[in-house]
UniProtKB/Swiss-Prot annotation:
Source species, domain of life: Bacteria
Protein species of origin: Ligilactobacillus salivarius (strain UCC118) (Lactobacillus salivarius)
PROSITE patterns named in the record: MRAY_2
A molecular function GO annotation: phospho-N-acetylmuramoyl-pentapeptide-transferase activity
GO biological process, one term: regulation of cell shape
UniProt entry keywords in alphabetical sequence: Cell cycle, Cell division, Cell membrane, Cell shape, Cell wall biogenesis/degradation, Magnesium, Membrane, Metal-binding, Peptidoglycan synthesis, Transferase, Transmembrane, Transmembrane helix
Enzyme class: transferase
Function: Catalyzes the initial step of the lipid cycle reactions in the biosynthesis of the cell wall peptidoglycan: transfers peptidoglycan precursor phospho-MurNAc-pentapeptide from UDP-MurNAc-pentapeptide onto the lipid carrier undecaprenyl phosphate, yielding undecaprenyl-pyrophosphoryl-MurNAc-pentapeptide, known as lipid I.
Cofactor: Mg(2+)
Protein name from the UniProt record: Phospho-N-acetylmuramoyl-pentapeptide-transferase
Family of the protein in this entry: Belongs to the glycosyltransferase 4 family. MraY subfamily.
Membrane topology: Multi-pass membrane protein
Cellular component per GO, a single term: plasma membrane
Amino acid sequence: MNSMLLIIAPAVCAFILTVIFVPMFISYFRKRKEGQMIREEGPKWHQKKSGTPTMGGFVFNLAILAVVLVFGLLTKNLHAKLLIITFILVLYGFLGFWDDSIKLWKKQNEGLKAWQKFLGQVVGALLFVFVFVHEKLPLSLALFGHELHLGLVLYTLFAIFWLVGFSNAVNLTDGIDGLVSGQAIIAFATYGIIAYYQGQFDVLLFCATVIGALLGFIIFNHKPAKIFMGDMGSLALGGALAAVSLMTHHELALLVIGFVFVMETASVILQVASFKLTGKRIFKMSPIHHHFEMCGWSEWRIDITFWCIGIICSAIALAFIL
């Protein structure tokens, strides 16, 4: 299949499926009068979002899964690499589904315990490494033009840290309408370009499909959001993004490409550390997007600013990689 068609066709199909089924999902939640419970310690004006349909990740994850499998078969790109990335999306999405379901059933903002999420994420990372070894892919990191060979044990620990860390980083970023959807589109587009230049058309197929699904989802997720992606969406996207970075062998570039996710996570770590050590907070609220909200920024202003940061950082990364 022509490389451009490989990008456009799955993206369009994922977009159409998402646009068709998200409104049905929204209608289902509204009829049942179920929706997201908003945490009380967040910005007070977020309380008006309480009851907004959630678990939108269920729709776009299914769209991604269906399109990847169909086009993987049609284009003969259904290789182990594509399957393991898709598996990470599904497994981490399932953890998010479980988490979101508990919140809905118990009508609270707390779902799975931290250790339960962590255990599931670690299992996914171990299976990812197993496929890596089976496919005889390099157990090393690309570092300033050099290969840093880690070996099986260190690479396994790194993969666990990377997959767990970025799935949670994306989850932390999902605090205002549309932010993660837009940022994930930018990140997957960047890695799609990298995969294209590497000739990894299976990874390119996955990235294109995710972009199409998220373009369909953001129509309903931008401010004011008609639906949230929930943990099912954010954990899945974060895990899949980390997996793609490992498969393209440009893992550390994700620190730049996904700088917004790193910044959000760092703001939480700094806030907690500062409060425990000094009793004072660095930010008005964390993650940092809430700090800007407390400073009077609108959600749209935060979205556009953070997306621009993401685009600039991705352009810098591509300039060094390509």
